[in-house]
Amino acid sequence: MGFGDLKSPAGLQVLNDYLADKSYIEGYVPSQADVAVFEAVSSPPPADLCHALRWYNHIKSYEKEKASLPGVKKALGKYGPADVEDTTGSGATDSKDDDDIDLFGSDDEEESEEAKRLREERLAQYESKKAKKPALVAKSSILLDVKPWDDETDMAKLEECVRSIQADGLVWGSSKLVPVGYGIKKLQIQCVVEDDKVGTDMLEEQITAFEDYVQSMDVAAFNKI
């Protein structure tokens, strides 16, 4: 198992393909598996690898919670497609004296008792919440306007990037291109969200992260279901 060399374009492509239908490296919540792979990626993936970039930006937002994420961090070769071998650690990046920056801002030290307790508490809370079936789920229908930089922006790629955003409580719907003038068209796309899981701030943050394609995002309509 593995992703090849995650410092190389080929390895990032394997990661992008792997995440095409997944939100996380393992399971349905951020875990130490995501931390292990994130730390092996030296910089944000390019915009055309939209699945990998979406995952990278999402996991980066958990910087302060790194130690408390569930699971046990394993070697890179324990994650990824079964038919690909991990080679990320075969180069100079194995050295502890390299200049790579730990984007999580901490060393691989032993987990403190407080961090362990906090992680176990959060995991227990998550499992408890998952086991309870809510009587009523509040949902909203949102219409988003996603604007490109200019008339040369690849709108098909822009829409692909937007739809690559996956989250529990988010369902993408229909879309269309709407002329705005000077040959420029904006993407108008519908989505349904569960209010306690997905907000417009989260959508805007993840959509505008595709900055090579997206200039801005606006909420055109918002209706409770």
UniProtKB/Swiss-Prot annotation:
GO molecular function: guanyl-nucleotide exchange factor activity; translation elongation factor activity
Processing and modification events after translation: Phosphorylation affects the GDP/GTP exchange rate.
Residues where Phosphoserine is found: 8, 42, 95, 106, 174
Pfam name, any one: EF-1_beta_acid
GO aspect biological process, one term: response to ethanol
Signal sequence annotation: none
Composition skew (Acidic residues), residue ranges: 96-113
Keywords, in A-Z order: Acetylation, Elongation factor, Isopeptide bond, Phosphoprotein, Protein biosynthesis, Ubl conjugation
Positions of post-translational Phosphothreonine modification: 88, 93
GO CC, one annotated term: cytosol
Matching InterPro entries: eEF-1beta-like_sf (IPR036219), EF-1_beta_acid_region_euk (IPR018940), EF1B_bsu/dsu (IPR049720), EF1B_bsu/dsu_GNE (IPR014038), Glutathione-S-Trfase_C_sf (IPR036282), Transl_elong_EF1B/ribsomal_bS6 (IPR014717), Transl_elong_EF1B_B/D_CS (IPR001326)
Region (Disordered) residue spans: 78-115
Family matches, as CDD domains: EF1B, GST_C_eEF1b_like
Record's keyword annotation contains Transmembrane: no
Domain GST C-terminal: 2-84
Keyword Acetylation: yes
Cross-link (Glycyl lysine isopeptide (Lys-Gly) (interchain with G-Cter in SUMO2)) at residue(s): 147
Modification N6-acetyllysine occurs at: 7
Source species, domain of life: Eukaryota
Induction summary: By homocysteine (HC), may mediate accelerated synthesis of free thiol-containing proteins in response to HC-induced oxidative stress.
Binding partners and assembly: EF-1 is composed of 4 subunits: alpha, beta (alpha subunit of the eEF1B subcomplex), delta (beta subunit of the eEF1B subcomplex), and gamma (gamma subunit of the eEF1B subcomplex). Interacts with elongation factor EEF1A1.
Function (record text): Catalytic subunit of the guanine nucleotide exchange factor (GEF) (eEF1B subcomplex) of the eukaryotic elongation factor 1 complex (eEF1). Stimulates the exchange of GDP for GTP on elongation factor 1A (eEF1A), probably by displacing GDP from the nucleotide binding pocket in eEF1A.
Family: Belongs to the EF-1-beta/EF-1-delta family.
Record's protein name: Elongation factor 1-beta
Annotated source species: Homo sapiens (Human)
Origin organism lineage: Eukaryota, Metazoa, Chordata, Craniata, Vertebrata
Gene giving rise to this polypeptide: EEF1B2
